[in-house]
A protein has these predicted regions:
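Extreme N-terminal segment that seeds HTH/winged-HTH DNA-binding domains in transcriptional regulators
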Residues: 1-33, 39, 85
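Beta-hairpin "wing" of winged helix-turn-helix
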Residues: 27-28, 32, 59-69, 75-76
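N-terminal helix-turn-helix
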Residues: 33-65
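Short linear capping/connector segments at secondary-structure termini
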Residues: 38-39, 75-77
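A generic membrane alpha-helix/interface feature
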Residues: 45, 72, 79-80
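Conserved segment of winged-helix/HTH DNA-binding domains
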Residues: 78-90
Length: 90
């Protein structure tokens, strides 16, 4: 997953937004596993703590969930949650 970041906003917010974009476009479907924070940090060349902070935002919003010892997965209904959140922000 290739990501380019701007210097206007914190990187962890951009990570969360790009993951949401990937879910909306179908790159990650509901109940599908997403890259780990380590994979994300290596592919994006960012600190693992930054990747984790972005992912944790999505967990808090109910877009991703963690399966202990397995990884992170897209929640059922995540697409609608993202759309609703973005409509509210607009």
């Amino acid at each position: 997953m290739l990501m380019h970041f701007d210097s206007e906003r914190p990187v962890f917010l951009q990570v969360a937004e790009k993951m949401e974009d990937a879910i909306l476009t179908g790159a990650f479907e509901e109940e599908q596993q997403v890259p780990s924070t380590t994979e994300l940090s290596v592919s994006c060349k960012i600190n693992p703590a930054t990747a984790l902070k972005g992912i944790n935002l999505l967990v808090e919003d109910g877009i991703l969930y963690k399966k202990r010892g397995v990884g992170m997965f897209v929640c059922t209904g995540a697409v609608e949650k993202i759309r609703s959140k973005r409509r509210m922000a607009f």
